[in-house]
């Protein structure tokens, strides 16, 4: 699903390597952002975590998702940090596209 819908290259054994991500995408970062146990930010997911993926073209990836029947569960107005949208993976995990 992640390869087909989001275009993420997944190795045959299920791992995603991005050793050159910083060089390919200046300004990209790995962010670890713990939330309080009682947060509702992950809803409608009941999972304990969510992925936040920085993308080069939010409109383009949302169009790609729509081609595969995946519609955003939430979109946000533009803000200082960029544009965001939330989608759900088939296992019910929320993905924040940024």
Placement of each model-derived feature along the sequence:
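Short secondary-structure boundary/capping segments
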Residues: 22-24, 40-43, 76
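Vicinal oxygen chelate
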Residues: 13, 39-98
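Short hydrophobic-acidic sequence motifs that mark active-site Asp/Glu residues
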Residues: 31, 50, 94
């Amino acid at each position: 699903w992640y390869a087909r819908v989001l275009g993420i290259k997944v190795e045959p054994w299920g791992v995603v390597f991005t050793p050159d991500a910083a060089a390919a995408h200046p300004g990209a970062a790995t962010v670890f952002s713990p939330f309080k146990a009682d947060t509702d930010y992950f809803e409608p997911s009941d999972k304990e975590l969510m992925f936040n993926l920085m993308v080069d073209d939010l409109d383009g990836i949302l169009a790609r998702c729509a081609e595969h029947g995946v519609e955003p569960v939430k979109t946000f107005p533009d803000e200082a940090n960029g544009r965001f949208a939330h989608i759900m993976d088939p296992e019910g995990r929320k993905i924040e596209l940024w």
